[in-house]
Amino acid sequence: MQPKFKKMLYGGDYNPNQWPKEIWDEDMKLFHQAGINSTTINVFSWAKIQPSENEYDFTELDEIVDTLTKEDVQIVMATSTGALPAWMVHRYPEVARTDFEGRHHKFGHRHNACPNSPVFQKYAKRLAEKLAERYGDNKNIVCWHISNEYGGECYCENCAKAFRVWLKDKYKTLDEVNKAWNCLLYTSPSPRD
């Protein structure tokens, strides 16, 4: 990875795997015409890269990286952990997030992982390591993009437990939580149970 940027990056997300490969060359021409010099790739490609638990296939991502590198387009490499693959949710349902209404989400959309699931953490770490091993020395990769934008909060027991641990570590006592969060404003402090 480069120690610093050569110039101001100008670009956005690029998902060429959603289009026929014949379009990629035209994309590069349009990038140059528009002055685009960087692009974020691989944001939601986990299912494509890891089609099953112990199988990884970087063929298409290699082609995308090679195309962008050949055209000297700077790459922001995402870890692909913004959306779970179906096999993972089927085999390990606890990796999917639970929303504020208690609904357990499935695969097929973004922000669908429980960040405190040990299974999610294990596979996300393994994928990030494999990406770093494979692409870490590529001079056109200028930074790494982890997960995606904020969203997809999880309210499962793993997350509730982790939140309580965080509160205790940060504030030490419930009185300090109430003070810091101004919980006495609406007549009563947070309950102690």
What are these model-derived regions, one by one?
Residues 186-193:
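Conserved small/polar residues in nucleotide/adenosyl-binding loops
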Residues 100-103, 166-174:
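Acidic, His- and aromatic-enriched active-site or binding-groove loops in soluble protein domains
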Residues 11-15, 40-42, 76-80, 145-147:
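A cross-family glycoside hydrolase active-site/sugar-binding cleft signature
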Residues 28, 42-99:
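Aromatic-lined substrate-binding rim segments of carbohydrate-active enzymes
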